């Protein structure tokens, strides 16, 4: 690739300015939840893969966790398997779980692995069933149907939450040149498979390995105040206040809960990142401004 002198100087300046960040994060583990537009736009896909390879090359240990809800929905439709949702969660019987495993652990996972390998990295695709490193337990949801006086606990099938994470399995990758790409499928002691929310898996993996950062890629610009302004830096106490006054609500709550849990468990910072921005992960790591909202135990300005 040919550069003009001016362009070459700009590149050199960027590389030089990134040195303090490289020194700070070398040897650290970053857990990145990959989803949203970043997973469906070809240019963003290629950029994400290169960014992950770059992290590994400079000594950062990235762990990628991915979702795949739309792809699961598409495959179920092709197979004429009807999807039913309760409180936004897919009811997952045995037949549906077979499709979930096929799509998440096969199609989507291997597409991401291939992207990273094409960018020059050495990625390996795994699910929580490999070495049973993600133990799961069944998730029951509270649901109040029309006419009911109180909510009831509903069994929605093979949908779970993380019971534990075997860190020794993940440490193997940290000490190698392999980049783990995790499909969010867990397993219980009886060998039953469970589909787990990818944000939740990313958060619990970050907690278990003592990650420096948890990064959740989304299709929004970050956490916003009631006027629509992006809040670039928040303490956990400030986030609690924003939840209490209704600023943070709805679909953002599960992501924020994962981020809060991770930070409260010792992860240095969690980031809600705009995955629609090219190279969003690098911008969040190697610049002061970033492209989303940083959540930590420190108030902004301290």
UniProtKB/Swiss-Prot annotation:
Matches recorded under CDD domains: AAK_NAGK-C (cd04250)
Gene3D superfamilies named among the record's database cross-references: Acetylglutamate kinase-like
Pfam short name (any one): AA_kinase
The protein's Enzyme Commission number: 2.7.2.8
Annotated residues for binding of substrate: 68-69, 90, 195
Primary location recorded for the protein, binned into one broad class: cytoplasm
Cellular component aspect of the GO annotation: cytoplasm
Keywords: Amino-acid biosynthesis, Arginine biosynthesis, ATP-binding, Cytoplasm, Kinase, Nucleotide-binding, Transferase
UniProt GO BP: arginine biosynthetic process via ornithine; L-arginine biosynthetic process
Annotated pathway: Amino-acid biosynthesis; L-arginine biosynthesis; N(2)-acetyl-L-ornithine from L-glutamate: step 2/4
Compartment(s) of residence: Cytoplasm
UniProt superkingdom: Bacteria
Record's catalysed reaction(s): N-acetyl-L-glutamate + ATP = N-acetyl-L-glutamyl 5-phosphate + ADP
InterPro entries: AceGlu_kinase-like_sf, AcgluKinase_fam, ArgB, Asp/Glu/Uridylate_kinase, Glu/AcGlu_kinase, NAGK-C
Gene Ontology MF annotations: acetylglutamate kinase activity; ATP binding
Residues with site note (Transition state stabilizer): 33, 255
EC class (word): transferase
Function: Catalyzes the ATP-dependent phosphorylation of N-acetyl-L-glutamate.
Family: Belongs to the acetylglutamate kinase family. ArgB subfamily.
Name by which UniProt lists this protein: Acetylglutamate kinase
Phylogenetic classification of the source organism: Bacteria, Pseudomonadati, Pseudomonadota, Gammaproteobacteria, Oceanospirillales
């Amino acid at each position: 690739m040919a550069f003009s002198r001016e362009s070459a100087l700009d590149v050199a300046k960027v590389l030089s300015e990134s040195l303090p960040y490289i020194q700070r994060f070398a040897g650290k583990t970053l857990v990145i939840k990959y989803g949203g537009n970043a997973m469906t736009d070809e240019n963003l896909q290629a950029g994400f893969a290169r960014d992950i390879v770059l992290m590994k090359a400079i000594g950062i240990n990235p762990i990628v966790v991915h979702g795949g809800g739309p792809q699961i929905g598409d495959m179920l439709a092709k197979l004429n398997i009807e999807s039913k949702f309760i409180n936004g969660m897919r009811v997952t019987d045995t037949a549906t779980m077979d499709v979930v495993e096929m799509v998440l652990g096969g199609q989507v996972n291997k597409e991401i692995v291939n992207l990273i390998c094409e960018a020059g990295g050495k990625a390996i695709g795994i699910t929580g069933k490999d070495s049973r490193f993600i133990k799961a337990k069944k998730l029951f949801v509270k649901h109040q149907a029309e006419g009911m006086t109180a909510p009831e606990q509903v069994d929605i099938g093979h949908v779970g939450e993380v019971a534990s994470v075997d860190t020794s399995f993940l440490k193997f990758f940290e000490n190698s040149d392999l980049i783990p790409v995790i499909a969010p499928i867990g397993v219980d002691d009886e060998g039953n498979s469970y589909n787990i929310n990818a944000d939740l898996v990313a958060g619990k993996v970050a907690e278990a390995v003592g990650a420096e950062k948890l990064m959740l890629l989304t299709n929004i610009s970050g956490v916003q105040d009631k006027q629509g302004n992006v809040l670039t830096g928040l303490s956990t106490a400030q986030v609690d206040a924003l939840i209490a006054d209704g600023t943070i609500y709805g679909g953002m709550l599960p992501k924020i809960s994962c981020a809060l849990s991770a930070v409260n468990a010792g992860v240095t910072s969690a980031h809600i990142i705009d995955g629609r921005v090219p190279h969003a992960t690098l911008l969040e790591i190697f610049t002061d401004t970033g492209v989303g909202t940083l959540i930590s135990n420190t108030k902004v300005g301290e």
